[in-house]
Amino acid sequence: MTSRFGHSQHPRRGRSARARAGRREGVQSNFPATQVLERSAHSLPARQRTALVMAGGTGGHIFPGLALAEALRERGWQVHWLGTPGSMEERLVPPRGFAFEPIDFSGVRGKGLKTLLALPLRLARACLQARAVVRRLQPDVVIGLGGYVTFPGGIAARLARKPLLLHEQNSVPGMANKLLSRLATRVYTAFPNVLPDAQWVGNPMRRAFTRQPRPERRLAGREGPLRLLVVGGSLGAKALNDIVPQALAWIHEQDRPIVTHQSGESQIEALRRSYAAAGVEATLTPFIEDTAAAFAEADLVLCRAGASTVTEIAAVGAAAVFVPFPHAVDDHQTTNAQYLVKVGGGWLVQQADLTAHGLAEMLQNMKRQDLLAKAQKARTMRKINATRDIVAACERLAR
């Protein structure tokens, strides 16, 4: 029997029909429909988020980018890297398991009038190539860390309305980051007061730098010759390679520091000849696998003043003599070094003032207690949460 609306007037028979229908669909009849939908939604796998990292040209841009890329991957992100063919980033990034997206663009400073005149066409082509990468990947965030490749990638990101995060490693901003900072969603810096409306977070770096024991624990009870670490970087520092062996030769053998000297692959043979000619023994290496441990082991570091080097020395808490690269753009290495030197966290010696005799005298006059004080002051300037803060911002923007 049915009502005038055509529904069954026998409730038990009606519920049985619904139950049979539910079983046919694989759904228990005693669950409300909303609960079934919620349970189905929660069982779906979460969409994998994608980040496009842009950094190139030098290790100072690339290694902070790799620290961020690895942290994002640990959080389940898929990370792609925008770079240029035949570059340092193309050599370093793919072996670490990140997809490399090449576009054709390079620097213009010091390349002559012909290169400068061709810039508009080259930039337009690079922007189109970057735009194609962004369209294909549809990244949740785009992260620029400097180098010329960042500029066309940043333009492409904003045209596609993708969140653009910038990080400037140096105390003097590079051209690409300076131009893009007005368009970016978030801007971060490794040093204070670098770009307007930027958040000072420090430099992204591997956890090994932030987990070394404090200087007073590392240096407690040390005796004997000082342990000197000379760091020339990936390309080496010819001035250090030439002067340091001569300086050590001025010091009596019993008083000489125990030296580890890193020079870069291209200069290792010349460095061996320099030490042999000076009659000085040292551990010579083209590359240091664990830089954090090497900084922690040294009583004194003699090095250039790239942004990564300065901020990593601060993170570990190590005494350092900084010799800025004199041809760095806008002399930014001098400004980088002053961040620690101005608080008593190191020494600054311009390359033009660096002599073998002067360096020998400086090393002979150094005492461990003085080096410990420098290391402690350097450590007070460390900012170690950049990776955490930038990754957290990426996750907020990707929701």
Swiss-Prot record:
GO cellular component term, pick one: plasma membrane
GO biological process: carbohydrate metabolic process; cell division; cell wall organization; lipid glycosylation; peptidoglycan biosynthetic process; regulation of cell shape
Binding site for UDP-N-acetyl-alpha-D-glucosamine: T58, G59, G60, N170, R206, S234, I288, Q333
Membrane topology: Peripheral membrane protein
Reaction catalysis annotation: di-trans,octa-cis-undecaprenyl diphospho-N-acetyl-alpha-D-muramoyl-L-alanyl-D-glutamyl-meso-2,6-diaminopimeloyl-D-alanyl-D-alanine + UDP-N-acetyl-alpha-D-glucosamine = di-trans,octa-cis-undecaprenyl diphospho-[N-acetyl-alpha-D-glucosaminyl-(1->4)]-N-acetyl-alpha-D-muramoyl-L-alanyl-D-glutamyl-meso-2,6-diaminopimeloyl-D-alanyl-D-alanine + UDP + H(+)
Domain of life, per lineage: Bacteria
EC number: 2.4.1.227
TM region positions: none
InterPro entries: GlcNAc_MurG (IPR006009), Glyco_trans_28_C (IPR007235), GlycoTrans_28_N (IPR004276)
Molecular-function GO term, any one: UDP-N-acetyl-D-glucosamine:N-acetylmuramoyl-L-alanyl-D-glutamyl-meso-2,6-diaminopimelyl-D-alanyl-D-alanine-diphosphoundecaprenol 4-beta-N-acetylglucosaminlytransferase activity
PANTHER family, sorted: GLYCOSYLTRANSFERASE (PTHR21015:SF22), UDP-N-ACETYLGLUCOSAMINE--N-ACETYLMURAMYL-(PENTAPEPTIDE) PYROPHOSPHORYL-UNDECAPRENOL N-ACETYLGLUCOSAMINE TRANSFERASE 1 (PTHR21015)
HAMAP family the UniProt entry points to: MurG (MF_00033)
Record protein name field: UDP-N-acetylglucosamine--N-acetylmuramyl-(pentapeptide) pyrophosphoryl-undecaprenol N-acetylglucosamine transferase
Gene symbol of the encoding locus: murG
